[in-house]
Amino acid sequence: KEITPDYMGFEVITPDLPEKMYAGMIIGYQVSPMLGIKMDWLTEITQVKELEFFIDEQRIGPYTIWHHQHHLSPLENGVYMKDIITYQPPLGFLGAMANGLIINRKLKEIFSYRKNILEKRFGIFDPNQSRK
């Protein structure tokens, strides 16, 4: 929640999540991606390799397809994070138009916000820093 812009109204609604993530874990959210309209979003953690990566996929939500890879690499002074997202908006041609006009730009804005928050909290990635 802390790494998502406030205007998204992002809230985890699944109670009592375990400390450790596991494949098959279902997480429910409420999010307001457009015009403050709340919608449910349900994702499943489909793969986890502890301290290396995890993948979440949408089961219910705003996209036809949402596949989000979170990669982690230890560094001397922290952790390098990389997100790889594959998505498809709903509504065929109309969704493709909305993607070109709004959705893609919004996603870039959201992940830029996330990157800025993480850099403020943990420091800026130095590509010359060696990975462990």
Regions found by a protein language model. Give the residues of each.
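Beta-strand/loop substructures that line and gate deep hydrophobic ligand-binding cavities in soluble
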Residues: 58-109, 129
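Short structured motifs
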Residues: 11-15, 27-28, 67-69
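Short, cysteine-centered beta-strand-loop-beta hairpins and adjacent loop/turn segments enriched
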Residues: 33-39, 89-93
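Substrate/cofactor-recognition hotspot
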Residues: 114
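Short, highly charged C-terminal tails/helix-capping segments
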Residues: 12-18, 119-132
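A short, structured loop/turn motif at beta-sheet edges
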Residues: 18-22, 46-53, 71-80
